């Protein structure tokens, strides 16, 4: 089964070029595949694709430093998510958006969260994008999709921000598992990696 996964160097080239990656979690964790790409490179068309084939619960993982710069506090003082996902207050970019929910608006908000020139006052809270705080140390400390997205962006030499959403099956709306993700990747020409590969890559 190992040959279904793309080598990390090849995946990073695709990521730098604004392509999606399918990133598989550990089987004993969530065992799901997320579509992930660099936040700064998301377009309206890419966002529409992401929403169409996913749960639609679009999240933007940020480094802790970036989340602090934008003054994005935790959604709850004591988080209760069973996997320890660090949700912050939701937001929309203020300028150039309307309702905040369209593919255009969500792509603009996502790019703006990645933009180092954006300031806290540039965002309306609450909104339609869910920023996530990656833990310091990224995958060396927590093996989640949040950290994987920021790790990929960092390795690619991009801003420490990604955009992610869980892939779901058309027929029943359940999460895609590995076999589903393999078929989806083949159909749409999207490379697949897993978090274990990334951990091994950064440990070299």
From Swiss-Prot:
The modification S-glutathionyl cysteine is found at residue 59. Binds 2 divalent metal cations per subunit. Magnesium or manganese. The record marks 128, 166 as: Essential for catalytic activity. S-glutathionylation is reversible and dependent on a glutaredoxin. D-ribulose 5-phosphate binds at residues 34, 85, 142-146. It catalyses: D-ribulose 5-phosphate = (2S)-2-hydroxy-3-oxobutyl phosphate + formate + H(+). Mg(2+) 1 binds at residue 30. Changing residue 92 to A: Loss of activity. Alters protein folding and stability. GO terms for biological process: riboflavin biosynthetic process. Keywords: Glutathionylation, Lyase, Magnesium, Manganese, Metal-binding, Riboflavin biosynthesis. It comes from the Eukaryota. Homodimer. This is 3,4-dihydroxy-2-butanone 4-phosphate synthase.
């Amino acid at each position: 089964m190992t040959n279904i996964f793309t080598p990390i160097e090849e995946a990073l080239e695709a990521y730098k070029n604004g392509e999606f990656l399918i990133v598989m979690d550990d089987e004993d964790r969530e065992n799901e595949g997320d579509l992930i790409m660099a936040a700064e490179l998301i377009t309206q068309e890419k966002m529409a694709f992401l929403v169409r084939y996913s749960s639609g619960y679009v999240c933007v993982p940020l480094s802790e430093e970036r989340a602090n710069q934008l003054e994005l506090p935790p959604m709850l003082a004591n988080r209760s998510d069973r996997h320890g996902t660090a949700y912050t207050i939701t937001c929309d970019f203020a300028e150039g958006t309307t309702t905040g929910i369209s593919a255009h608006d969500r792509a603009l908000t996502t790019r703006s969260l990645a933009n180092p020139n954006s300031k806290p006052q540039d965002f309306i809270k609450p909104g339609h994008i869910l920023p996530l705080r990656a833990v310091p140390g990224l995958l060396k400390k927590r093996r989640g999709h949040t950290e994987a997205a920021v790790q990929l962006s960092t390795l690619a030499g991009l801003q420490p921000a990604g955009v992610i959403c869980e892939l779901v099956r058309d027929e029943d709306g359940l999460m895609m598992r590995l076999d589903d993700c393999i078929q989806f990747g083949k159909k749409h020409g999207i490379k697949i990696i897993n978090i274990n590969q990334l951990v091994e890559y950064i440990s070299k």
